UniProtKB/Swiss-Prot annotation:
Subcellular localization: Cytoplasm
Pathway named in the protein's UniProt entry: Amino-acid biosynthesis; L-arginine biosynthesis; N(2)-acetyl-L-ornithine from L-glutamate: step 1/4
GO terms, biological process: L-arginine biosynthetic process
Protein name (Swiss-Prot/TrEMBL): Amino-acid acetyltransferase
A GO term from the CC aspect: cytoplasm
EC code: 2.3.1.1
Enzyme class: transferase
Protein source organism: Edwardsiella ictaluri (strain 93-146)
PROSITE patterns: GNAT
Catalytic reaction list: L-glutamate + acetyl-CoA = N-acetyl-L-glutamate + CoA + H(+)
Length: 441
């Protein structure tokens, strides 16, 4: 009998909204030289090919910093940098070309594999490289001559779009040519950032050793706004980590985000399948830089009925919440506040005012099972409390059968039924025997 995997089925079903959302979008993926040197590089290439098969338009920008440094040391030359940028003299440029050429051939070969026993079976991917970027010299800075290190002068956007429209993966490295026929060594971060901005890409994705950006408590920050990301970058630079791939990418991600790129993602090249987990799951696995949070807390409207019902029905069936019909929800929808993440309602609560007694009831508090160990309940309580104060209410009460201690930890005190508004006392269900807790606003 064949083995059945419900986990596979559920995972695939949950990924469908993201597959549909990403189809036809442009992603710029930055592969640092460190990522290419790792054993998981083959898995990353397979995942990139999978994105292509799902109809995502891909530009892959690769680096070769450690590979170049290795060649230099073999030649008994020390790598030289100024402000995190390589000083590329004529001898170094030759080694840059050698390393970049080797990496490009390796990536192209991997993406061209189509054997029947490989993840790329039947893929037939066209990989295109070319002079899409025109460079110019960096020149002299602080008395330091960068020699053949350069920066972007212009990008041939029309030619890039033509290749993407034809279904090709565009592969670009750190070497670009100039109008004078010279070659220049550019930073991978600059190329990836400017390409994402020029193409108005949906996403800029970078790989580093860490799983993402660490929060103050040591956990991975799921998302950062540009100002928050800048603070993290400043802290990393102050700690002497300016040269790290993650720090360099974050600088570019901040610029891209402020220039119209939807989201920038930082994920680990050490984690197998990190690219797929980041793009096809609700919470991802790394850190994303966004202008606007993927998670919002707002007042509900009539279009949210379905999402709220899906959230509260299991709790109603368990007897935790009092059952509400769709019709009742439609009548009372303006009472509800919800937290939404990627179009999914993950938490909700309602505020029922009793103006005569200057009291309000916080009711129908529900949090999605995946988020119950987070701060979503706290966020809802803060928002409902703020709304109650705006209404001129002086007290807030709840009726609960399961969350007595949670509310007590937040300043609510147990009271008797006679402390409720008269209208609420008349409706109190003595069979349900809900605990009543009240707090002063």
């Amino acid at each position: 009998m064949k083995e059945r995997s419900t986990e596979l089925v559920q995972g695939f079903r949950h990924s469908v909204p993201y597959i549909n959302a990403h189809r036809g979008k442009t992603f710029v993926i930055m592969l640092s030289g460190e990522a290419i040197a790792e054993a998981n590089f083959v898995g990353i290439i397979n995942d990139i090919a999978l994105l292509h098969s799902l109809g995502i338009r891909l530009v892959v920008v690769y680096g070769a910093r450690p590979q170049i440094d290795t060649l230099l040391r073999e030649q008994r030359c020390d790598p030289r940098y100024h402000k995190q940028i390589r000083i590329t003299d004529a001898r170094t440029l030759a080694l840059v070309k050698q390393a970049a050429g080797q990496v490009q051939l390796d990536i192209t070969a991997r993406l061209s594999m189509s054997l029947s026993n490989t993840p790329l079976a039947g893929a037939h991917i066209n990989v295109v490289s070319g002079n899409f970027i025109i460079a110019q010299p960096l020149g002299v800075d602080d008395g330091v001559d960068y020699c053949h290190s350069g920066r972007i002068r212009r990008i041939d956007e029309a030619a890039l779009r033509c290749q993407l429209d034809a279904g090709a993966i565009v592969l670009l490295g750190p070497v670009a040519v100039s109008v004078t026929g010279e070659s220049f060594n550019l930073t991978t971060e600059e190329i990836a950032t400017h390409l994402a901005i020029k193409l108005q890409a949906e996403k800029l994705i970078g790989f580093c050793a860490a799983q993402g950006v660490c929060s103050d408590d040591g956990s991975i920050a799921a998302e950062l706004l540009p100002n928050e990301a800048e603070q993290r970058v400043s802290a990393l630079e102050a700690a002497g980590k300016a040269a790290q791939a993650s720090t360099r990418f974050l600088r570019g991600a901040i610029t891209a985000c402020r220039s119209g790129v939807g989201r920038s993602h930082l994920i680990s090249y050490l984690e197998d399948g990190a690219l797929l987990q980041e793009l096809f799951s609700r919470d991802g696995i790394g850190t994303q830089i966004v202008m606007e949070s993927a998670e919002q807390i707002r007042r509900a409207n009539i279009n949210d009925i379905g999402g709220i019902l899906a959230l509260i029905r299991p709790l109603e069936q368990q007897g935790i919440l009092v059952r509400r019909s769709r019709e009742q929800l439609e009548r009372e929808i303006e009472r509800f506040t919800l937290i939404e993440r990627d179009s999914l309602t993950i938490a909700c609560a309602a505020l029922y005012p009793f103006p005569q007694e200057r009291m309000g009831e916080m009711a129908c508090v529900a949090v999605h099972p995946d988020y119950r160990n987070s701060a979503r309940g706290e966020q809802l309580l803060q928002r409902i409390t703020a709304q109650a104060r705006q209404m001129g209410l002086e007290k807030l009460f709840v009726l609960t059968t399961r969350s007595l201690h949670w509310f007590q930890e937040r300043g609510f005190q147990p009271v008797e039924v006679d402390m409720l508004p008269q209208q609420k006392q008349a409706l109190y269900n003595y069979q349900r025997r809900s605990k009543i807790l009240l707090t002063e606003l």
